[in-house]
């Protein structure tokens, strides 16, 4: 939702504080929720799988997941003995549009009959991203050319030339390069049906922050003087995180509770924003998250789990653009999820009570929030494996420290942001209906949903300026979200040794505030159609993805044009039925289209990457 070096997921039009990003059940413990230019500390090429959580089950992980959660599963803490003396996975890849060079490897080694040692590492480096046309949107180019004309008329030809140069920038996105590396080590103890493990990890990245061309703002120096900054100045972020994790899964026998699951994560996170060669603003966050969950043995048709969760975050920022004061957030929660099956009907219920304390020490402000969330789901198992379901929910979210206490220039959003220490809890009532299952040999999923928000928290432009930046305030107003999602995967040909599959996907969401204005950054309708041929040695896939334009915008947004992406991929398994070696060749955005995602804060000056050829090899032994 921001740029190549820093992006977060968008689920059903929700992002930021309303979508929780997890690593094996606990938070990533970075500060990506505080600003869209702050990266998540997850290296994609070391991920084993990704789960998108919605419905009653999401209440196990926090009221912040009011819009859903993304749970990233990796292998840093081993939970089973390898089948061989050691197991090695390796990956290497390159691409053309960003000059990507990347590699990763992980190794699991059995020690005796009960211990497993794991180590993994990765490295990734890119250059500036190439694009198929102008960097700036037509609206922003027109604005800069008008400013250039004004500067020329005022007798400032050098500044006019700078504006014209920025408006004419095309072919690549300056300062969009990045480099990152990770190193993780873990140890797992397997004792029958119980497992224990711990891991240590290091994440290090450096990436460019892409500023809006032509931006200027002033900030006060320590001595009280004001220094003017040009938006074209190169800004980079150097980010480091040390992380320690523990995981336990204890088998309790055949009583009421089958097992006890323990999970703890500790993070020491620092990132520094460099303005040229000078240190600008430093963000530091130390956090601990711990959870204990008791899983019930199935009693008849009843199963479930209950637990407790604790969250502690100590956040500190210092520098000219430390727009959030030092703050401490503590949360304690209890939760339960219960499932009851009666014949073809399954009932699922979840509840979560959460107690949050947010304190800004330097301001002398402390806020307490007690929130309760609940969800109820009903699923009917129809004929031939088709499932029909409906979920209802009521969720509450305490305001974040950033929403409460922000007060300063935030260059990532091109705004001077002002929080409100008197914000109330945000409440959402949700209703979701779905049908999913099989159609012959194919599968489908159709979902319709609606969410009614009370006290929805959002940024609103005030019409004022501070430090040459527009002033935005965090406000609250009721809001209404609704949308539909559809997926179909069907084999057109299914014979021994050859399959031809089709994929069809559609997604649409609409949202508006109680006063009838649009909620900002809502994605438009998107459609995807694909054909995929599969043989013993080859997979060949071609897809077309279309994004509608978005003209339902707020006063401070610009409309976004529609665009179409055409992609292709070939995967070759030289050992045929053996999956140990896979070579991939891919082409993304074949027609070099300039596309802009409306959900992005920076879509007017950070378009999608242009035509990109990728090659990779994956080994597993």
Predicted regions: what they are:
Residues 27-56:
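Short acidic/polar hinge/loop motifs at secondary-structure boundaries
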Residues 174-180, 193-259, 266-289, 320-321, ...:
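Flexible loop and strand-edge segments within Gram-negative outer membrane beta-barrel domains
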């Amino acid at each position: 939702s921001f740029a190549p070096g820093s992006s977060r997921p968008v689920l059903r039009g929700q992002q930021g504080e309303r979508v929780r990003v997890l690593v094996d059940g606990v938070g990533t413990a970075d500060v990506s929720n505080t600003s869209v230019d702050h990266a998540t500390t997850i290296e994609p090429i070391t991920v084993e799988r990704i789960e998108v959580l919605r419905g009653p089950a999401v209440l196990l992980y926090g009221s912040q997941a009011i819009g859903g959660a993304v749970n990233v599963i990796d292998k840093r803490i081993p939970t089973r003995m390898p089948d061989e003396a050691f197991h090695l996975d390796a990956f290497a890849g390159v691409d053309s549009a960003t000059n990507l060079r990347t590699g990763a490897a992980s190794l699991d080694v059995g020690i005796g009959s009960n211990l497993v040692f794991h180590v993994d590492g990765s490295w990734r480096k890119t250059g500036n991203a190439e694009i198929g046309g102008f960097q700036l949107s037509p609206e922003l180019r027109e604005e800069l050319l008008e400013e250039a004309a004004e500067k020329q008329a005022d007798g400032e030809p050098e500044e006019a030339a700078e504006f014209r140069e920025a408006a004419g920038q095309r072919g690549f996105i300056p300062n969009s390069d990045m480099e990152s590396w990770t190193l993780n080590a873990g140890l797992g103890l397997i004792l029958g049906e119980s497992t224990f493990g711990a891991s240590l990890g290091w994440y290090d990245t450096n990436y460019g922050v892409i500023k809006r061309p032509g931006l200027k703002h002033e900030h006060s120096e320590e001595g009280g003087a004001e220094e003017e900054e040009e938006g074209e100045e190169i800004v980079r972020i150097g980010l480091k995180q040390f992380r320690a994790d523990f995981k336990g899964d204890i088998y309790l026998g055949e009583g009421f509770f089958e097992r006890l699951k323990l999970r703890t994560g500790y993070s020491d996170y620092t990132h520094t924003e460099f303005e040229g060669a000078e240190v600008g603003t430093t963000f530091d966050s130390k956090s601990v998250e711990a959870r204990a969950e008791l899983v019930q043995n199935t009693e008849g048709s009843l199963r479930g789990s209950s637990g407790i969760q604790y969250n502690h975050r100590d956040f500190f920022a210092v520098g000219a653009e430390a727009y959030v004061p030092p703050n401490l957030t503590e949360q304690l929660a209890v939760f339960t999820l219960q499932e009851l099956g009666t014949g073809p009907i399954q009932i699922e219920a979840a509840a979560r009570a959460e107690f949050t304390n947010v304190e800004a020490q330097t301001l002398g402000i402390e806020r307490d929030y007690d929130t309760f969330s609940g969800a109820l789901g009903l699923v009917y198992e129809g004929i031939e494996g088709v499932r029909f379901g409906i979920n209802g929910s009521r969720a509450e979210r305490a305001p974040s420290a950033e929403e409460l206490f922000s007060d300063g220039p935030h260059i990532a959003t091109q705004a001077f942001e002002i929080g409100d220490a008197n914000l109330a809890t945000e409440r959402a009532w949700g209703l979701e209906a779905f049908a999913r299952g099989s159609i012959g040999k194919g599968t489908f999923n159709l979902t319709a949903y609606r969410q009614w928000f009370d006290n929805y928290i959002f940024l609103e432009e005030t019409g004022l300026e501070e430090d040459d930046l527009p002033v935005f305030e965090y406000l609250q107003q009721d809001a209404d979200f609704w949308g539909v999602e559809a997926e179909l995967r069907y084999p057109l040909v299914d014979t021994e040794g050859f399959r031809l599959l089709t994929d069809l996907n559609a997604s649409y969401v609409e949202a508006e505030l109680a006063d009838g204005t649009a909620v900002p950054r809502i994605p438009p309708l998107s459609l995807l159609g694909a054909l995929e041929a599969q043989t013993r040695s080859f997979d060949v896939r071609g897809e077309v993805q279309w994004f509608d334009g978005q003209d339902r915008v707020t006063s401070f947004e610009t409309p976004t044009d529609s665009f179409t992406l055409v992609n292709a991929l070939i995967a070759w398994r030289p050992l045929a039925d053996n999956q140990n070696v896979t070579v991939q060749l891919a082409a993304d955005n074949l027609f070099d289209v300039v596309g802009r995602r409306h959900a992005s804060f920076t879509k007017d000056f950070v378009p999608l990457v242009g035509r990109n050829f990728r090659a990779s090899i994956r080994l597993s032994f």
